[in-house]
């Protein structure tokens, strides 16, 4: 035998062994009952020497069921956020141009920016004289004396809305990918809707928590010197309590109390804060009592949690923080986030925290922010909740951490920290999303139909195997061996790349098996023709493969092009069919041209060999 034959044998054996190895997780996955396949029971059942447990064959929504969520993106909120950032940018732009102004604010329902200045004309000329701003906005007039307004063009607002939906879809896709759900179907629908299908996932509450969470991380400076909230003492009752904390439950109307806060200039003061039993109660107090006292361009009220109690048994209440309105820094600058254990010498020591790392630009901005606000409290606000508000004791640049509320067991805190780290890494949604539809979907086909379909496929495959042996005898048996390896190889590749097997995917799989059989039929018929022409067995096999090679390649490549087009322009089930088809075609060429030839050359290695064909 030639040396090249031994190399080809080694290749075939290696491919077969690797395919079996790759399918080990799938073997353990399908051995378990359906309700245990996506749990720790599966993770612990896979041997340590096997591939990663996540590399197993997955069944699609039509075969195993799952969760379907439809989410609406609040594009108007996204526009307001974008306009508010533009207002801050215009302020920085005017400072850079040394143009005098007294302030910027968002007006006109969140779609216009108003700049107050002694000379509004100078502000208008500076802003609209800049190419970047003149392409986006114009001055509609209607501003009060001593101010000028800038409105965004309709095309720009439309672009803001479209980008908000696209960014939301991208963020949701990133979260699902980091979550480990394989082959989700995520697509944008009409009316700013995004539909998400999660095959095999059975926990709708966890899905809503991770996908629906906005994950807007903001850093704001506390305005502890401002006594404006002291006025609420005449409108609300005082909270009752002692040195151990507040006496719960609190009045339904909310109540006020004081907390000592350090001042940047030295010393301290008793700052007023408002507390309530629930977030809903506190939000009502803020809307009715506190917001009328504030200038919304200067201050906002943040909501955080407090705990009362000793040891592991604690009761949560909700409290206010008076913050500056301006968001100094956002989570857009976070490069990475992970769960860690607090090592500080505080009550948080040993508890899970979310550590994060800023991007280079974020590190520069954080360093500037902390250096300018020494001895002030900096609130970390995640989705409108103040997670922590420590004092800035030194300059912070690239690394930071978010502490979590106490009063819960360690596992709950780990789960929350994992969820926060995941959404921070995947990015924040550009605007809040609301769940408009939620369904736990059962398998479309049902267990009985799946069983019957599987039985039909196996019976059909068995008939093909028997036919090949009866009609082609020895060479038919070789073709059957190649067919088995073909199926093994296709399933192994699908499990390795995380492809989900759907009903259309099964159709693609069966089609490629049929093409593999067809290729072997062409080879066997060609070998017969060469033997009828008087050539010996060895020559017939060699010429048979050589002369049918391009016919097989041509048919497979033509179908492969069609599969690529379907994958590129199709979606959902069509892409599933295309992926399986492409993998199967490549495997079919390998088994038909390489595997069967290696076996045939072994049995016909002598000129006097006989062949049953």
UniProtKB/Swiss-Prot annotation:
Signal peptide positions are none
Q: Which GO BP terms apply?
A: intracellular protein transmembrane transport; protein targeting; protein transport by the Sec complex
Q: Which GO terms describe its molecular function?
A: protein-transporting ATPase activity
Against InterPro entries, the record matches this protein to:
Acrflvin-R, SecD, SecD/SecF_arch_bac, SecD_1st, SecD_SecF_C, SecD_SecF_C_bact, SecDF_P1_head
Primary location group: membrane
| Annotated TM spans | 10-30, 452-472, 477-497, 503-523, 548-568, 576-596
Q: How does it sit in the membrane?
A: Multi-pass membrane protein
Which key words tag this protein in UniProt? Cell inner membrane, Cell membrane, Membrane, Protein transport, Translocation, Transmembrane, Transmembrane helix, Transport
Q: Where in the cell is it found?
A: Cell inner membrane
- Output a single Gene Ontology CC term carried by this record: plasma membrane
Q: Which family does it belong to?
A: Belongs to the SecD/SecF family. SecD subfamily.
Q: How does it assemble?
A: Forms a complex with SecF. Part of the essential Sec protein translocation apparatus which comprises SecA, SecYEG and auxiliary proteins SecDF-YajC and YidC.
The job of this chain, per UniProt, is described as: Part of the Sec protein translocase complex. Interacts with the SecYEG preprotein conducting channel. SecDF uses the proton motive force (PMF) to complete protein translocation after the ATP-dependent function of SecA.
Classification via NCBIfam families: 2A0604s01 (TIGR00916), secD (TIGR01129)
What name has this protein been given in UniProt? Protein translocase subunit SecD
Q: Give the species this sequence originates from.
A: Anaeromyxobacter dehalogenans (strain 2CP-C)
Q: Identify the taxonomic lineage of the organism of origin.
A: Bacteria, Pseudomonadati, Myxococcota, Myxococcia, Myxococcales
Identify the gene encoding this protein: secD
């Amino acid at each position: 035998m030639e040396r090249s034959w031994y190399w080809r044998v080694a290749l075939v054996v290696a491919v077969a062994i690797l395919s079996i190895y790759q399918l080990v997780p799938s073997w353990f996955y399908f051995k378990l009952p359906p309700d245990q396949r996506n749990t720790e029971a599966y993770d612990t059942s896979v041997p340590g020497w096997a591939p990663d447990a996540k590399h197993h064959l997955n069944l699609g929504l039509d075969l195993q069921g799952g969760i379907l969520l439809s989410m609406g993106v609040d594009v108007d909120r996204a526009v307001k956020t974008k306009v508010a950032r533009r207002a801050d940018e215009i302020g920085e732009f005017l400072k850079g141009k040394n143009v005098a102004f007294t302030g910027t604010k968002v007006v006109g329902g969140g779609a216009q920016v108003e700049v107050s200045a002694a000379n509004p004309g100078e502000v208008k000329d500076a802003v609209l004289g800049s190419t970047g701003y003149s392409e986006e906005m114009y001055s509609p007039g209607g501003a009060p004396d001593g101010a000028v307004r800038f409105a965004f063009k309709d095309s720009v607002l439309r672009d803001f809305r479209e980008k908000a939906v696209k960014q939301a879809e991208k963020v949701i896709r990133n979260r699902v990918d980091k979550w480990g759900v394989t082959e989700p179907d995520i697509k944008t629908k009409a009316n700013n809707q995004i539909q998400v299908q999660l095959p095999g996932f059975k926990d709708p509450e966890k899905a809503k928590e991770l996908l629906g969470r906005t994950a807007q991380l903001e850093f704001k400076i506390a305005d502890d010197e401002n006594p404006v909230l002291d006025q609420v003492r005449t409108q609300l009752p005082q909270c009752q309590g002692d040195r151990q904390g507040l006496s719960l439950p609190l009045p339904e109307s909310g109540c006020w109390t004081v907390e000592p806060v350090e001042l940047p200039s030295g010393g301290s003061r008793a700052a007023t804060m408002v507390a309530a039993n629930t977030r809903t109660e506190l939000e009502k107090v803020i809307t009715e009592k506190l917001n009328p006292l504030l200038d919304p361009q200067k201050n906002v009220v943040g909501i955080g949690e407090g705990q009362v109690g000793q040891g592991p048994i604690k009761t949560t209440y909700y409290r206010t923080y008076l913050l500056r309105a301006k968001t100094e820094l956002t989570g857009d600058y976070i490069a990475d986030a992970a769960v860690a254990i607090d090592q500080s010498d505080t009550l948080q020591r040993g508890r899970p925290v979310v550590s994060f790392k800023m991007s280079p630009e974020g590190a520069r901005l954080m360093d500037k922010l902390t250096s300018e606000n020494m001895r002030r409290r900096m609130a970390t606000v995640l989705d409108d909740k103040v997670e922590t508000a420590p004092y800035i004791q030194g300059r912070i640049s690239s690394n930071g951490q978010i502490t979590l509320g106490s009063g819960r067991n360690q596992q709950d805190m780990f789960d929350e920290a994992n969820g926060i780290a995941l959404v921070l890494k995947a990015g924040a949604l550009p605007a809040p999303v609301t769940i408009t539809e939620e369904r736990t979907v059962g398998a479309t086909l049902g267990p009985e139909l799946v069983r019957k379909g599987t039985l039909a496929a196996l019976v059909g495959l068995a008939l093909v195997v028997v036919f090949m042996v009866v009609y082609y005898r020895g060479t038919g048996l070789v073709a059957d061996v190649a067919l088995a390896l073909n199926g093994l190889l296709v399933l192994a590749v699908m499990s390795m790349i995380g492809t989900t097997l759907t009903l259309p995917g099964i159709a693609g799989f069966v089609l490629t098996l049929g093409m593999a059989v067809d290729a072997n039929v062409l080879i066997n018929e060609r070998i017969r023709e060469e033997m009828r022409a008087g050539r010996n067995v060895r020559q017939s096999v060699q010429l048979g493969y050589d002369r049918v090679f391009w016919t097989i390649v041509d048919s497979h490549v033509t179908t492969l092009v069609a599969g690529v087009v379907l994958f590129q322009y199709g979606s959902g089930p069509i892409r599933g069919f295309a992926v399986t088809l492409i993998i199967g075609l490549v495997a079919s060429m390998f088994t038909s041209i390489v595997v069967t030839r290696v076996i045939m050359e072994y049995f016909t290695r002598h000129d006097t060999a006989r062949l049953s064909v």
